[in-house]
Amino acid sequence: MPQGGIDEGESPQQAALRELEEETGVTSARILKESAGWHDYELPKDLWGTALKGKFRGQTQRWFAMEFDGSEDEIDIGEKPTQKAEFDQWKWEVSDKLPGLIIPFKRKVYKAVIDEFSEFLV
């Protein structure tokens, strides 16, 4: 599930679509719903100073449910000339399995987002 920062002058919606394209190559998607609020997590203390470029102890995020209406050959998680790959694999998965696939300190956020967007998920 792509994530990233909001650039200056950019709306959260624009940032979500940009991050989706940067991290997966996907441009054939549309926003269905924006989360009602912001979701946050804190890094475990042993990651302070190293994760998130060493500058932050966690993140506050706005989430979006999107519909992908392209074909799978559009998905490209490989390294780009100006950007290192952020993922080494991808797969479609049913929503109730997603929290188990993510690092433990982000699971609470994933569960909340899945609950909030349940009307769109399988």
Language-model features, listed with the residues they occupy:
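A short gly/proline-enriched turn/hairpin at secondary-structure junctions
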Residues: 1-2
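Unchanged
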Residues: 6-104
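Charged phosphate-binding loop/patch that engages nucleotide di/tri-phosphates or the phosphate backbone
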Residues: 95-122
